[in-house]
Amino acid sequence: LLISPYSMYRYDASYALEVFANYPTRFGLIKPFNPGDADVGDQVSRWADIPGVVGARIMLAYESQFSADHGGVKAIMHAGAAAGIPVNILCWGNLDKAQEIARQHPNTQMIIDHLGLKQPFEPPVPTGGFDNLEQVLALAAHDNVAIKITGACTLSTKPFPYADIWSPLEKLFTAFGFERCLWGTDWTRATCLLTYRQAVEAFRVTDSLSVAEREMLMGGALSAIYGWSPG
């Protein structure tokens, strides 16, 4: 999936749309929306009608002024449900808001980005990267919430294959079930911390996953939740 990067393009998905036009069988598209826009619900509806679109996104980690009760947040969630597309939530530092959004919108498929945990862009890796894990685990109580296991390797304080990530990840797998866990590398953010190959191989070489668990985590759950797979 190709998520239009907020850090580079804010709410403009032009580049992601250009990439999709060149490689229409390779990518599904997700873009962030500004809850402060008066017509944001209509924006989501129009976005959902574009070929290749599979989701929307709310950037609570960077737009923390928006509460769960904000009209724009509600509009995005309602529009996502009406269009049948998931809404991704980047919510590190705002897990309480994510909990309330999930409670208020049980009919909207919600995806927690980046494990719900703040992750580094460059070394050194901070200690205590999984300190807020219990708050993340609490989100599993909502059936409409799934979680992306993106960037997990960037929270490791060990070298490849990052042996210290598996204890916290196993808690997530138990809480959510593999059918609600979506693997990803987040490599474009993590280029200063690991290679793309390392981000993939860490999940392929581990004996912490069965064949069936690995297949669900590394594609099966994503295809089911987003209704998309590469052409």
Task: Outline where the language-model segments fall.
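Short catalytic/ligand-binding loop motif for oxyanion handling, primarily in non-cytosolic enzymes
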Residues: 9-13, 65-66, 119-121, 155-156, ...
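Catalytic pocket-lining loop regions of alpha/beta-barrel enzymes
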Residues: 54, 67-182, 230
